[in-house]
């Protein structure tokens, strides 16, 4: 149903593909993931292909994005964290572009799918684990032993630290997924009020003014949320990478 606020999140198969009983179909979510990568890469290529001493608007945005993420990574993970800049910058641009594309009419918001955000979160935590053990060996386990804690309390503190670490991909993915899902549902509900009241004639148009104003305000807020959620995802990624670089630093 067109008035169903959750209809916009439904997955539809575009190219059905099944191999060995496993569904590998190319869906609308797959299409917009490809579109997200293409848009982000295309913008950065366009913005930097004709660089000048006096940057244009596109080049300025690209350079600001670069410096923004680089500064975030230095503050969150130190100078040694810059080796992860390509990863963090790619994640930031992917999430931001996906969020912004999802604001366009009839576009699909891939970050409103928990499987997408959870996959991104697992990638981040997996990188932390692989690098942590590669760089520090079993010394990485010092991450779960906070400095200054009396030995008698370690039996209580260590399990709490382990559970806290294991919950990171869950909290990281749900935070992004829930914010995008809730925001788009709210927008759809208010837009539905506007359409329904507007169809009732002059009286309905008058009654639709408040929902219309709310829709405009919420749209502006959602653009802000689109950036903030990409920022939060990148900041938390930097913090988690810092644990891999300095496992005994907390």
Curated annotation (Swiss-Prot):
It is found in: Cell inner membrane. GO terms for molecular function: proton-transporting ATP synthase activity, rotational mechanism. The chain crosses the membrane at residues 29-49, 84-104, 114-134, 143-163, 189-209, 216-236. It is a multi-pass membrane protein. InterPro entries: ATP_synth_F0_asu, ATP_synth_F0_asu_AS, ATP_synth_F0_asu_bact/mt, F0_ATP_A_sf. Keywords: ATP synthesis, Cell inner membrane, Cell membrane, CF(0), Hydrogen ion transport, Ion transport, Membrane, Transmembrane, Transmembrane helix, Transport. GO terms for cellular component: plasma membrane; proton-transporting ATP synthase complex. Pfam families: ATP-synt_A. It comes from the Bacteria. Signal peptide: none annotated. HAMAP family: ATP_synth_a_bact. F-type ATPases have 2 components, CF(1) - the catalytic core - and CF(0) - the membrane proton channel. CF(1) has five subunits: alpha(3), beta(3), gamma(1), delta(1), epsilon(1). CF(0) has three main subunits: a(1), b(2) and c(9-12). The alpha and beta chains form an alternating ring which encloses part of the gamma chain. CF(1) is attached to CF(0) by a central stalk formed by the gamma and epsilon chains, while a peripheral stalk is formed by the delta and b chains. Key component of the proton channel; it plays a direct role in the translocation of protons across the membrane. Belongs to the ATPase A chain family. NCBIfam families: ATP_synt_6_or_A, PRK05815.2-4. This is ATP synthase subunit a. It comes from Allorhizobium ampelinum (strain ATCC BAA-846 / DSM 112012 / S4). The lineage of its organism: Bacteria, Pseudomonadati, Pseudomonadota, Alphaproteobacteria, Hyphomicrobiales.
């Amino acid at each position: 149903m067109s008035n169903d606020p959750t209809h916009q999140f439904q997955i539809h198969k575009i190219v059905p593909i099944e191999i060995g009983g496993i569904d590998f179909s190319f869906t609308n979510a797959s299409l917009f993931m490809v579109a997200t990568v293409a848009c982000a890469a295309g913008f950065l290529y366009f913005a930097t292909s004709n660089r000048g001493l006096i940057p244009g608007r596109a080049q300025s945005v690209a350079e600001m994005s670069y410096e923004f993420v680089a500064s975030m990574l230095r503050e969150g993970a130190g100078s040694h964290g810059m080796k992860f800049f390509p990863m963090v910058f790619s994640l930031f641009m992917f999430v931001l572009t996906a969020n912004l594309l999802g604001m366009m009419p009839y576009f699909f918001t891939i970050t409103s799918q928990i499987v997408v955000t959870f996959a991104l979160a697992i990638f981040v935590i997996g990188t932390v684990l692989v690098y942590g053990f590669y760089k520090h060996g079993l010394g990485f386990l010092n991450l779960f032993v906070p400095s200054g804690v009396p030995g008698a309390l370690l039996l209580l503190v260590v399990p709490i630290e382990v559970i806290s670490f294991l919950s990171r991909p869950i909290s990281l993915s749900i935070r992004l997924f829930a914010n995008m899902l809730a925001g788009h549902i709210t927008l759809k509900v208010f837009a539905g009020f506007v359409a329904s009241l507007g169809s009732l004639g002059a009286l309905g148009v008058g009654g639709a003014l408040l929902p219309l104003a709310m829709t405009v305000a919420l749209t502006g807020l959602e653009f802000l949320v689109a950036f903030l959620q990409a920022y939060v995802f990148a900041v938390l990624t930097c913090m988690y990478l810092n644990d891999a670089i300095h496992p005994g630093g907390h």
